[in-house]
Curated annotation (Swiss-Prot):
The keyword Nucleotidyltransferase applies. It is an enzyme of class 2 (transferase). It catalyses: RNA(n) + a ribonucleoside 5'-triphosphate = RNA(n+1) + diphosphate. Promotes RNA polymerase assembly. Latches the N- and C-terminal regions of the beta' subunit thereby facilitating its interaction with the beta and alpha subunits. Required for kasugamycin production and aerial mycelium formation in S.kasugaensis and responsible for pleiotropy. Its EC number is 2.7.7.6. The gene is rpoZ. Belongs to the RNA polymerase subunit omega family. It comes from Streptomyces kasugaensis. One of its GO terms (biological process) is DNA-templated transcription. It comes from the Bacteria. HAMAP family: RNApol_bact_RpoZ (MF_00366). Pfam families: RNA_pol_Rpb6 (PF01192). Keywords: DNA-directed RNA polymerase, Nucleotidyltransferase, Transcription, Transferase. InterPro entries: DNA-dir_RNA_pol_omega, Pol_omega/Rpo6/RPB6, RPB6/omega-like_sf. This is DNA-directed RNA polymerase subunit omega.
């Protein structure tokens, strides 16, 4: 019996090696993905209120998919860019 249910996307997919190509370090990747996941979570929270301050997911999502998994897939697809912010000159 075949099933049409696909394997869930998670922390192991996309692979970390591919994700690290988008950032300078693992630390940057974690911060980058966490900030985007917060934006996605806020977007879903605001849908019920009619406020659309944040941009929703840029990739197709599933009902039970977590915001962090969505953010990692967006980064892997090259839909987001990360820019370094320079500190104040001393």
């Amino acid at each position: 019996m075949s099933s049409s249910i696909t394997a869930p996307e998670g922390i192991i997919n996309p692979p970390i090696d591919e994700l690290l190509e988008a950032t300078d370090s693992k630390y940057s990747l974690v911060i980058y993905a966490a900030k985007r996941a917060r934006q996605i979570n806020a977007y879903y929270s605001q849908l019920g209120e009619g406020l659309l301050e944040y941009v929703g997911p840029l990739v197709d999502t599933h009902v039970h998919e977590k915001p962090l998994s969505i953010a990692l897939r967006e980064i892997n697809a090259g839909l987001l860019t990360s820019e370094a912010i320079e500190g104040p000159a001393q």
